[in-house]
Amino acid sequence: MTQKIDKYGVEAQFIRSDIMKIAVFGASGGIDKFVLKHALDKGFGVVAYVRNPSKVKISHKNLIVTTGELNDYENIKKAITGCDAVISTLGVPMKFTYESMDSLAGHKNIIKAMKEVGVSRLIDWATPSVHYSKDARSFITIIPGIMATILFPKAKKEIITIADAIQSENLDWTIVRFMAPKDTPYTGNVKVGFGYKKMNFSIAREDIAAFMVKQIESSEYIHSMPIIGS
């Protein structure tokens, strides 16, 4: 049975103490529900930090759902305490402009809490608007940034600022970049590159989630920003 935790939080307690534990932020949306599914399928213990627990439709003995806001630092810290890694799929509004950068504020609290409780592994996301030192100059590394500048300038700024904040800290981070998540069937086949490999922008949300979860037990892309597509 899933243990529900109220907004004040408690430290994660699972039936088994020998399993890897991860905290997932943004666990009630499109990609996020698949992150929960694949993490639980791998036998991980999962603490899902959400604003609205009724949106979490999965029930599992190794899933704890904790309710909180992104500005609630103490509750975020409690969710991360005892975990081995963090996955964030916190979104940003894909609008021309908007008022507050809630995802950035939440990331600052997540990073601060990780450092305070001694958790170093972070898997996060961005778009190819965020440039990486190993990127080749190609359509997929250039055009998304131009499009975002025209259509979603504030979202682009927030995503880049989040990526900069993650890289500035002494964390074992991986930032998974993608362009066009779709509600298409899971394939299990993901193309990975840095602009030199031809791929389609569109990719199934579940494929994104599975790739992010896979990074928990892999060191291949630590301090790296792979671009994934289909």
Description of each model-found segment:
Residues 49-55, 178-180:
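Short, polar loop motifs at secondary-structure junctions
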Residues 136, 185-190, 215-224:
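Glycine/proline-rich active-site loop of Rossmann-fold NAD(P)-dependent oxidoreductases
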Residues 23, 54-109, 113-116, 216-217:
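NAD(P)H-binding glycine-rich loop region in Rossmannoid oxidoreductase-like domains
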Residues 103-105, 158, 176, 203-213, ...:
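Substrate-positioning beta->alpha
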Residues 45-47, 53, 97, 105-154, ...:
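Conserved Rossmann-fold NAD(P)-dependent oxidoreductase catalytic core, especially the SDR/UDP-sugar
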Residues 163-184:
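Conserved beta-loop-beta element that borders a ligand/cofactor-binding pocket
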Residues 23, 47, 174:
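Conserved beta-strand positions in the Rossmann-like core of class I SAM-dependent methyltransferases
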Residues 22-42:
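N-terminal Rossmann NAD(P)H-binding glycine-rich loop of SDR-like oxidoreductase domains
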